[in-house]
Amino acid sequence: MVHRFAATILPDGPSALDLPCQVNRPSVEGYPIPTLEEPHVTTIAIVGAGRGLGAAVARRFGREGHAVALLARNAERVDALAADLQAEGIDARGWVTDVRDPDALARTLEQANETQGPVEVLQYSPLPQKSFLRPLLETTVDDARGAIEFSVYGPLAAVHSVLQNMRFVGKGTVLFVNGGTAVRPAPKFAGTSLSFAAQSAYAQMLHDTLAPEDIHVAQLVIPGAIEEGHPQKDPEVLAETLWSMHTRRDEFRVFATEMDDEVRETAT
């Protein structure tokens, strides 16, 4: 069953980045947190989960015993994906949300955290909308605003909603998945060139800030499209790469393949 939640503003208080890592309190800002002595299921939350990369990552982490929270806009599709994963023995649930509504996204992640177990791995990988991939001189203010909401406000809300738990238990992983415009702007794709650059800066700052607390933040750059059967860009290959990034916990940026001279992007 897909879980649906309306936008809810979280309680006022310090942000997760302002909170020291503690090991002796039962809750943070009203949300229950397990003590370090209590056994618990580790959950990966995949924001932008679909039949391609999202499903492959869910299976890869699910094989290792992780519960999987699948977040997407389309209720029917995420419900079907969750059912398929459950049939394979993976503890998966679908959650309907919109990354352009930061309050709703944050609340949905909090509900997944409370229902499935602590979210200790967050993957932010929704495919950009077509309006974000217009040429520079055709890109409007509304187009740019949508891209920023999608790629900056969404990640900010998602990270802050799970970071309290990660800092409390003293570990966590945040994985960003981007196209080639994250590192090389392309006038043909103005929206993602602007917003992915900002997301990359945010992710790099998170990496540098949270590394001393064993919270690993990393970015996978996939130049061009995800391609089934491709030796480096097949969904299962990319899922293995993301698993390795989670377990190795070393470098910030990983390229799925070398950058071509011409940047290409994929959209929904």
Please state what every model-predicted region is.
Residues G50-R51:
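Conserved glycine-rich cofactor-binding loop
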Residues H66-D79:
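Conserved glycine-rich Rossmann-like NAD(P)H-binding loop of the short-chain dehydrogenase/reductase
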Residues L85-D103:
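Rossmann-fold cofactor-recognition segment
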Residues P118-V119, M166-G179, D214-I215:
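Active-site loop of short-chain dehydrogenase/reductase
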Residues P128, V141, A147, T173-A198, ...:
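Catalytic loop of short-chain dehydrogenase/reductase
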Residues L137-L156:
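Catalytic Tyr-X3-Lys loop
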Residues V159-H160, Q204:
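A short, exposed helix-loop element centered on a Lys and neighboring polar residues
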Residues Q204, P212-T268:
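C-terminal helical subdomain
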